[in-house]
Swiss-Prot record:
Heme b b566 binds at residues 97, 196. GO terms for cellular component: mitochondrial inner membrane; respiratory chain complex III. The chain crosses the membrane at residues 33-53, 77-98, 113-133, 178-198, 226-246, 288-308, 320-340, 347-367. It comes from the Eukaryota. Keywords: Electron transport, Heme, Iron, Membrane, Metal-binding, Mitochondrion, Mitochondrion inner membrane, Respiratory chain, Transmembrane, Transmembrane helix, Transport, Ubiquinone. Heme b b562 binds at residues 83, 182. Belongs to the cytochrome b family. GO terms for molecular function: metal ion binding; ubiquinol-cytochrome-c reductase activity. Binds 2 heme b groups non-covalently. This is Cytochrome b. It holds the Pfam family Cytochrom_B_C. PANTHER family: CYTOCHROME B.
């Protein structure tokens, strides 16, 4: 008699994805982040569901409902801070996952990579709308500034912004629709993640060497389940420490002030995980140019597979490309720092140089370096 997990219509799908899936023997802990992201999404959906039971999406009561959750609901404070800091963990895992893909050449699985880019955009949209919901000062002004960027689109821009706002300013209609979309999008993200996984299992996982490993595979369970559980424990430890010891470390104090349309905060800035893109946006003096640069800073990921000029897939044996990769990482950290600083000298020029560096490294220097490495290896 065949094993039930191999014959049952539903169980065999789970079995082929999580139990008997052949996985390269050489993959390292950098391959843990997919499962960590699914864990983050599960935490976010669960905590979000419990928060939605007590939250009211009305401008008059939204701020007070969040206060009520933290003060009066049993363990409301921990649910709220798990949700807020869970988003930060989500983006840390997301950026490390993308970095891994860039370093080891996983972007050559184009369908998986493109679905991943869609997932990134969906996650960013969800996080942005979630930041608006507590209806603090930074929520209101962040929503006003970021949605207003769409007015840079020629001809239809102003109408588009008013259509999104549901009026002539960010108000009750905006908050209600943002809550609706913020609730809906995580389920779309979960569906996209399934498609992401489906395409990945069509090709099989990449590995650190970048060399096909069809002859050297091991089953996912128990080897990688144990490895993933270790990563999960480490991530949950960090998240717990963040939530229990300094829950407001990554937040903005301005968001503890109720939204006031008549009083602009001194420095309007998004959450830390958007600061690199915000710095690129601010580094261009022209509004439309800034918006284009902002979108392209993420959309540039879609171009990377076409810029792969190396004869080797992974950067594991390419020291010059490795140096460039870590320069790019440092550049992104500099942009993140600049995004949180006021618009004044010397931050303006540092932001502009870092923005130019970001696009130049990806579009010009990396492909040329790969060609040089091919030449040095006489390929």
């Amino acid at each position: 008699m065949t094993n039930l997990r191999k014959s049952h219509p539903i169980l065999k799908i789970i079995n082929s994805s999580l139990v008997d899936l052949p996985v390269p023997v050489s993959i390292s802990s950098w391959w843990n982040f997919g499962s960590l992201l699914m864990a983050c999404l599960a935490v976010q959906i669960l905590t979000g569901l419990f928060l939605a039971m007590h939250y009211t999406s009305d401008t008059a009561t939204a701020f007070n409902s969040v206060t009520h959750i933290c003060r009066d609901v049993n363990y409301g404070w921990i649910i709220r801070y798990l949700h807020a800091n869970g988003a930060s963990m989500f983006f840390i895992c997301l950026y490390l996952h993308i970095g891994r893909g860039l370093y080891y050449g996983s972007y050559l699985y184009s369908e998986t990579w493109n679905i991943g880019i869609l997932l990134l955009f969906a996650t960013m949209a969800t996080a942005f709308m979630g930041y608006v919901l507590p209806w603090g000062q930074m929520s209101f002004w962040g929503a006003t500034v970021i949605t207003n960027l769409l007015s840079a689109i020629p001809y239809v821009g102003t109408d588009l912004v008013q259509w999104i706002w549901g009026g002539f300013s960010v108000d009750k209609a905006t908050l209600t629709r943002f809550f609706a979309f913020h609730f809906l999008l995580p389920f779309i993200i979960a569906a996209l993640a399934m498609v992401h996984l489906l395409f990945l299992h069509e090709t099989g996982s990449n590995n650190p060497t970048g060399i096909p490993s069809d002859t050297d595979m091991i089953p996912f369970h128990p080897y990688h389940t144990i490895k993933d559980i270790l990563g999960l424990m480490l991530m949950l430890s960090v998240l717990s420490a963040l939530v229990l010891f300094s829950p407001d470390l990554l937040g903005d104090p301005d968001n503890y002030t109720p939204a006031n349309p008549l009083n602009t905060p001194p420095h309007i800035k998004p959450e830390w995980y958007f600061l690199f893109a915000y710095a690129i946006l601010r580094s261009i003096p022209n509004k439309l140019g800034g918006v284009l640069a902002l979108v392209l800073s993420i959309l540039i990921l879609a171009v990377i597979p076409f810029l792969h000029t190396s004869k080797q897939r992974s950067m594991m044996f390419r020291p010059l490309s490795q140096c460039l990769f870590w320069i790019l990482t440092s550049d992104l950290l500099i942009l993140t720092w600049i995004g949180g600083q006021p618009v004044e000298h010397p931050y303006i020029i540092i932001g502009q140089v870092a923005s130019i560096m970001y696009f130049t490294i990806i579009l010009i220097i990396m492909p040329l370096t790969s060609l040089l490495e091919n030449h040095l290896l006489k390929w």
